Amino acid sequence: MPPIRWLSQALSWQHSYWLLLGASLLYIVPFLMADQTYADDYWRSQLAQGRWTEQGRPGVDLLYMVLGFSSGAINLFPLPLLLTTGLLAVSLTRLAHHYFSRPTALNCLIVLPVLYNPFFLQNLSYQYDGPGMVLSLCLAVEALLHSTCKPLKSSWKAALWMAAALALYQPALNVLVGLYCIEFIRSVEARKTFNALFSSLLSQLIILAMGLLIYACLAIPFIKGSRTHLLNINQGALQELDDRIQFLAQQIALLVHGELLEMTATIITLVATVKLISIATALLQYAEPLWRRVGVFFIFLVTAPLLIFLVSGTTLMLKDFIPEARTLTGFSILIVAALYLYERSCPPETLLPRLFIVLPLAGMLSLSFVYGNVLSAQKELGQHVARSIAYDIDALSQSRTLERIHLRGFYLQNWLPAAQSASNVLPVLGYLLNTHYLTLPEALPRTGIINVHKYTEPPVGEHLQPPVLIRPLYRVHLSENTGYLVLKKITEPQDYHPEH
């Protein structure tokens, strides 16, 4: 196996960085090629405003002020994504050299799922929000790395890194806590003293408390709306939590498709579980008082359920639950933990079992390119609808003056015939795309139509006249100088079966 022996050779810091940078850039190539304006990107690019501070994310406003040399939020895509991906590659390199004293190429790949999270593809779809979310991952990793050397003296630095990560994207907290769980597993496996274990845990709790306090002081006073409200504790709360967990479990299960991925996921999960159990049993053999062994043993047992909980984490507890893929940032750390435990289970100096690590990463990279093509298909459909609407509005405006046009019904099911066959093969694509619209009012100024506004219902006492124009995807009503553009609820099947 000489051609692939280089995979087992130790890499320098520079070589590790180039490997992780290349892999990271390769993962975002589909988004650069698709160049798709996604959801909130429409109104943000149209208004050149982000309004992230009122969502508890002032760091994103600051990011665009710095990169855009302005007080607004100008669309700079893809520059912010390229820059933040490069910074994340630096942090991933530091993390790989933290986990392994002399990391090989395969060792470096173990930390790659911090970015190679299939659910993070939806985050990367946002041209505005995506770079801030990538940077939040970078800062979460840095918070961990500043927690491990001289823990007590570096607590305030790590807390600042953590607060900065939360100011960019709050679910980054799930990533940091997940990294702390992996760190505890590594410490137990390395047979560190109980005093060292408890000192590290105490330091991490202090960092979390300080980071949350700093973030609360800087961001929470400016938050508007009810996004931070927690779920009401009542009789229906447990049922609501159970429904949310079941829904997320069903979506995560969509990832495992095909015999190869099923086999890969099963083997890595089983091996990682066995390794976790072996570390736990070895813990009971420590030459320490029984109460200490039992205490650390129970803390150790909590790490696995906690890693699973952190897939969605605190978003499960919010009153306004967001069931979308972009909130599942913690899934990345669950994959890192599984790959790390799998690697630690492989016999020393053996390459063949470790090559198995490449399979899930290759699958996630493949999914990224498939998803990029789906984004391109959605972009083409949206552009067609917007141009068709613009043409019809322009034709109607020649016979009468339309002072105002209301757009209604732009939230629809995921209807994308061009991607239906791909979704049948990869069911998770529909959950990742999650575009419940054909076009948005903010998309029409790109076609020269600037008097379109969104509304949900006709004004009180006003009834729509019979449509003057009916198209397959929408219809147009007129009332004096006001037009009503109603997107239809599409019932046609998406499947396309050409006759041969």
Protein language model regions, located:
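Intrinsically disordered, polar/acidic, low-complexity terminal segments
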Residues: P2-E54, P58, Y64, G68-V90, ...
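Membrane-interface micro-motifs in multi-pass membrane enzymes
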Residues: T53, R57, T84, A105-T148, ...
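Membrane-interface transmembrane helices that cradle and orient dolichyl/undecaprenyl
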Residues: A140-S155, E189-K192
